[in-house]
Amino acid sequence: MRHRRRHALAVASLGLCALLASAGQAVATEPASEQAGPSVAAAVTPLTASNFRYTLSETPSALVGALDSALPNVSMGTVADDGNRTPSCNSAPSVTHRTAYYCWNSGDQGTSAWYPQGITTSSDAYGSGTYDGKRINLVSWYDHADDGIDKGVRVSVSNLSASASAPPYRHVLLVEPSGTTSSPSYRPVNIHAGGLMWYGNLLYVADTSGGFRVFDLDHLWRVSTGNSSAIGRQSDGSYHAFDYKYVLPQTAKFTDSTAGGYAQLQHSSVSLDRTSTPDSVIVSEYRSPSAVDAGAQVRTIRVPIDYTDRYLKPASDGIIKATEAYRTDLESVQGSTAINGKFFFSQSDGSDHSNPNSDGDLHTFAAPSGALVRHGNALTVGAEDLSYDPTRDYLWSLGEYPGYRWVYAADASSF
């Protein structure tokens, strides 16, 4: 959960020029201080992309195999058909060019124990738009409770093929294999999970200060329920996961690094770009307003991904490197994606839902030399991650704050 105060866009200390001319007609009537509609804000600075790098490490296959032998494997389609929660919306979200939305059940809508962050869809997984024959949305939540037990990250599996407006869903707990091959176990994944990206059988989860955690849907396990405080292998040989019925294991990690004196990139969000060649991953970082005011850079990068093994793709020298990088200096960026060379950024504006100027903003720019264009109050309060569905031209996002947790899509081409 992150907060942002409304103020003029910080201009980079490198001397980015502010462009104050209007660039579009307002789409709704708002207070003069927060006039809606697109407006050109500031230029974007290209960076040396190859200075952003990754190193792959994998969970020992023998350990994953031992858990495969100990636990029943199930398919994503099985989990999607096993939804145990039904959403209910009390109102519709105010979203510019809105095309779809749904909610959570009352417990998930109001809880302060978990906060939703990342979103990805089966249109990321496969270009057909379905996985196991179903349209599925995945949303990550991080444990926000102060109960002495850090349960890590859970992922909501929503079955939109069953109902587009009220998809039944179930939470799956992310876990990291541990123990030995003779006594295999697992533990929670204690990260913020600010971004989520699904590619084939792999689920990429943003690890703020570490790069990406990767989870394999070919190893989706059913575990015992009935104990809300137990995790992993128990003394009687049973396996539990805080009363969640299914767990998804981490099978790989991409640890990030930099060269050329660049500061480490915060991995605050991640999305897939299927409109690039090859397919690629878009990563952006969150910086608070005070950090930007103090001169912190805010950057976004593009990294190619290989459709054959679903891993980030190395360059010809064998090193995994970004191929595009930009400095935007946008404060409070919560999500990003790219569509046909145009970048999109969601920006949160605090949690005061009674103030329409607390609604999230959407920013765009056309790479490589376009200026940032602000679409004021286009998203909901607490706007988070972004994901693009090219099969329907849906730009998905979601809200994080209790009581205002819509999951919604807008018509991407309208921005």
Where are these regions (language model features)?
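Beta-propeller blade signature
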Residues: 150-163, 216-237, 294-311, 357-370, ...
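Sequence/structural signature of beta-propeller modules
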Residues: 2, 6-107, 411-415
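Loop/turn-rich, solvent-exposed surfaces of beta-rich toroidal or solenoidal domains
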Residues: 124, 135, 280-384, 391, ...
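Blade-loop segments of beta-propeller domains
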Residues: 102-129, 139-194
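Conserved beta-strand element within WD40/beta-propeller blades
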Residues: 138-139, 204-206, 283, 345, ...
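Surface-exposed loop and turn segments in beta-propeller and other repeat-based domains
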Residues: 66-112, 167-187, 227-264, 311-329, ...
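Eukaryote-skewed repeat-based solenoidal scaffolds used as protein-protein interaction platforms
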Residues: 173-177, 184-195, 201-302, 331
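Structural signature of eukaryotic scaffold interfaces centered on beta-propeller domains
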Residues: 109-133, 189-199, 261-280, 329, ...
